[in-house]
Amino acid sequence: MLKRRFPAVAPEFNLTLRMNILDPTPVRSHVVTTDVEACDVLVIGGGPAGSTAAALLAQQGRKVVLLEKAHHPRFHIGESLLPANVALFDRLGLREQIEAIGMPKYGVEFVSPDHDHTVALEFSEAWDKSMPYAWQVRRSEMDEMLFRNATAHGADTREGWRVRNVDFDADGATVQATHDDGEKRTWRARFVIDASGRDTFLSNKFKAKQKNPKHNSSALFGHFANALRGEGKLEGNITIFWFAHGWFWYIPLADGTTSIGAVCWPHYLKSRTKPVKDFFADTIALCPQLVERLKDATLVDDAVYATGNYSYTSTHCSGERYLMLGDAFTFVDPVFSSGVYLAMHSAFESVDVVTAALERPAQAAALMQRFERYMRKGPREFSWFIFRVTNPTMREFFMYPQNPMRVKEALMSLLAGDIYGKTPIWRSLRIIKTMYWLVSAGHPRRTWLAWTRRRRNIRDLGPLVGENVVDAK
């Protein structure tokens, strides 16, 4: 049973970075501060990874500077969290605050155009039953909460500062940044953490960024009011709708709005010949089940946005005086909502590496090698399923879930983000993969057509350009 959720107040939806608050002091133009400020760690980017790392390191008594190019609250896509996030918010002391702003998310619903039923999977069905839910959140609220938490723990947090250059030497790094009022400053840091997200600051600097050869996708997205929702416990579940050119996310938020996006093949988005809002409407029309849920819905702020170049990685994520965290290192696809979890968990893992680099240099190299392996593990485990999520064989697995040899429990553990602990899911996940190959081999024509179509669809067609295009880096 679906119900309609009305927002109590008209929600704001502004993809551009929030305008600076008016300041009665005169605007400075091209002011250069000659003093060089010293710090132990300079963090680039005040999103989930950067703010978490800054808070944890400041708690240790480190002198931490956190530079965020925007001003919180600022919009960011990626509003769905995983149950594995809950423990991280506990460790940060922020669980109650997240509970207050989040919509409880107990599972995921799958809707296929080729099946006459839907499937709802709950996180309580995972191998470890102790992580039964997560939240859907407005990232503007959550990211600001994490940023202010870093401030509260002693980090020197600054907004409106864009890092322009980082020069490394044997003792650390010289970091130059510009404020959005024109002021320029220089910091001398013993260690640098790049948490710049899709700006991939250090990866670009070292020419380490690589397009993912196995995946390529683009997205259209907007927020809707008055969209239909599930009843009771099902209200906050994310829904994945497959359609001819990819899949849709459907994320109910606590204020009554619903975040909806189409993740599609680049060639489909590049075929657009009309305004992005109209193209999004045409795309939604390709999914009748989604059309039904939006029959009385209205687009918030009349705004739809597009983003391209979703998938990339980097050749490395660590160096003698730096680390790359979260999306600053790699990003694959948002289908399993893994981005925020991987970013925050990488911040927790970074603490021991930074501590060794600053205090026990002889141990740092081994810890950095371990960190490199860790940073590749999460995206690798999710990617195997992400690369195949639009394949008809994988779609059958999701639409007819079975649990022989605990394969369903293992899959739900993966979807919950339970990939770094001691939960023994790996044998069952290997069984899923074996079953996938056997079923695919049993349908050679279907498998061949799906493979050739995917190879054609993931071709690199160049950067996405046009109106309302964001993060096209």
Task: Report each predicted region and the residues it spans.
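FAD/FMN-dependent oxidoreductases across multiple families
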Residues: 101, 268-353, 359-370, 377
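Extreme N-terminal leader/targeting segments of oxidoreductases
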Residues: 6, 13-41, 56-60, 458-473
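Glycine-rich FAD pyrophosphate-binding loop
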Residues: 58-77
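Predominantly flavin-linked oxidoreductase catalytic cores and closely associated redox partners
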Residues: 149-290
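Short beta-strand to alpha-helix junction loop
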Residues: 127-148, 270-275
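Glycine-rich Rossmann-fold phosphate-binding loop(s) that bind the pyrophosphate
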Residues: 45-47
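N-terminal FAD cofactor-binding segment of flavoenzymes
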Residues: 76-115
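C-terminal helical "tail/cap" subdomain of flavin- and related membrane-associated enzymes
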Residues: 355-473
